[in-house]
Amino acid sequence: MIKRKQMWDNVLTVIMTLLCLLWVYPIALIFINSLKKEGTFTTSTVFALPTKETFVGLENYTYGIFKMNFLSSLGYSLLITLTSVVLILLCCSMTGWYLTRVNNKLSKFMNLLIVFSMVVPFQMVMFTLSKTADTLKLNTPWNICIIYLGFGAGLAVFMFTGFMKSVPIEIEEAAMIDGCNPIQIFFKIVFPILKPTMISTAILETMWVWNDYLLPTLVLDIKKYRTIPMAIQYFRGGYGRVELAPMMACIIIAIIPIIILYMTCQKYIIEGVVAGAVKG
């Protein structure tokens, strides 16, 4: 029995190692080619390491940062991501708390709507959304955060609701007896308890908003506001010409913050998701 378990553990380790290599390989390939001279890509050299003739160091990175106006794009990406995530965490944690503590037909109906919003794909509403956002003048970084709140609320409320079902209501009743109003109860009692789910939700929503290309392209005024994914697209020139080396360099720059965030906070993602799933 023990030998069989060890065998399956070894098989599982091999499978997970292969999957890890499969996921890391595209990033490694992009990084290697970002160090090569532009115009040296062929089907036979794209998988090869840089040589003395093709290696250019960080030249593609400096050129890419200059061309894509990196600081401006970074500023807009940070503004949209941070504002959207803060709105999602604040509004959805309150909503999850309300849906858990208030048991009536309205709360049940709202819960169904939230679950339904997770099922409906963005592509079904993107053209209508784009037209509505243009009519209502929502094509600015501040206003797009409201749209992100709407699309990110489903997952966030689902996670907060699942976690809140495990929190004893007696804690809040004791605070109410001590004279706390609902706002004080939420921020002084409930909010600190939600920390594991809060962190995991923040990381998941941050990765989504930071990497999103479609929604900013449809909503934002691309002449004034460009996030990092939008700016990378402008390495595609006319007549099918693409500056591959600088584009790959900027892709690496764009994913570095997310990789660092995930590697430093991955334990919170697992804890938060598992807590919400098991306790819900």
Segments and roles (model prediction):
Residues I2-G280:
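A structural signal for multi-pass alpha-helical bundles of membrane permease subunits
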